[in-house]
Amino acid sequence: MKGIRGISQLSTRLYSAQAARKLDVAAEHVKFQPQDVQVTKLPSGLVIASLDNYSPASRIGVFVKAGCRYESPDNQGVTHLLRLAANLTTKGASAFRICRGVEAVGGSLGVTSSRENMIYSVDCLRDHIDTVMEYLINVTTAPEFRPWEVSDLTSRVKMDRALAAQSPQMGVIEGLHGAAYKNTLSNSLYCPDYMVGHVDADHMHNFIQNNFTSARMALVGLGVDHDVLKQVGEQFLNIRSGMGTAGTKAQYRGGEVRVQNGSSLVHSAVVSEGAAVGTDEVMAFSVLQHVLGVGPHIKRGSNSTSKLIQGVAKATADPFDASAFNVNYSDSGLFGVYTISQSAAAGDVIKAAIGQVKAVASGVSEADLTRAKTQLKAEYLMSLESSEGLLDAMGSQALTRGAYHSPEVIAQMIDSVSATDVANAANKFVSGKKSMASSGNLVKTPFVDEI
């Protein structure tokens, strides 16, 4: 658009008889002072977080503690449909108006979800915040879920399931959670087959009513004034007060799931219970993950510095891949190794990868510890360079802690992790009850009790 305006102004200038004005080269440039993230918690429990980064583009998100872990046996898959229902008719705007209204200002509206949270976000030019904010508030607070519109989502649910089925990694990770937990976190991100076509408008309304309450929400903005965001929260996101339905604490049990198919590659994940968000050991597990290796840091690189790659390479001459797996939730976590190998070498690869974790449990060198900390800090800081990554970091912390830790504080927390902390984290994996998920030709793949 900038280029188009420039051309328009140029054509006007060509037909003008007036002399062009001289630029005042001595005029001072406007200097913007760097801003810090501002966080406010309203009496209703709603958290407002914002950062005015002076960007011409703004990004606003509503974070809700309403992931699939809060589904019950009666409404399994409801969060999957909510992801697809963001553009359906609301009490304040039709589906057509939402679609065309956001499109008309060059904005975008999207929904993502995890096992913990649902995130509704909008992007737009700074001048159109009011317009897209109206649609964001409508979608999150006043959905109608007309039965015929909900019914039309069935084909999209089936498509999502079919696309997910084509990803071995997705199948293994979903199966791993189902095997590892007795409840809550065992729920899938996708609607189970037996519920496809059976999640109706009543299920969706009840889930919204019980989980989309002020105390379970955070309104987060980039490139927006904090007072404006606070006013929006006070006026429009306080319609449902209270804590909503109390979530059940996750119960780790350990288990195994095996999916036998004709693939020549075996995907396998072996984990123990890890660290929950907010605990002292969560940072130690993150450093341990980078000590072991999380993938190449150079495009098309060999990842030769990874301890997992080094260890497994001694056990097989076949192609393989191995990385540390680490995921953290509000009350639990999973830590272990994820391997991809030829079916004939699966057993050797898995056992060699676990052997590397055992080696770290015996001690880690200062050089490896320093390298892992540097990689972790770089990964975190680079994730904040995109508006999406920064908004996610702000929203996740606001929803979990009601506050925001600056990158400097996070870096200090990483630096404070000692070699003993990392060894203790590795020992927790080694001694913990294992969970395992595998897919492929599993003839040579060991069972969880054999490793």
Description of each model-found segment:
Residues K31-Q33, A250-R253:
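Short solvent-exposed loop/turn micro-motifs enriched in small/polar/acidic residues
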Residues R300-N303:
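Divalent metal-dependent phosphate-bond-processing catalytic cores, especially two-metal-ion Mg2+/Mn2+ enzymes
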Residues L51-N53, F63-G67, T112, D123, ...:
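Acidic/polar N-terminal loop/beta-strand segments that form early-domain functional surfaces
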Residues I4-S58:
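N- or domain-start disorder-to-order transition segments that initiate the globular core
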Residues G45, D52-V102, L176, D280-G293:
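Active/ligand-binding-proximal structured segments within catalytic/core domains
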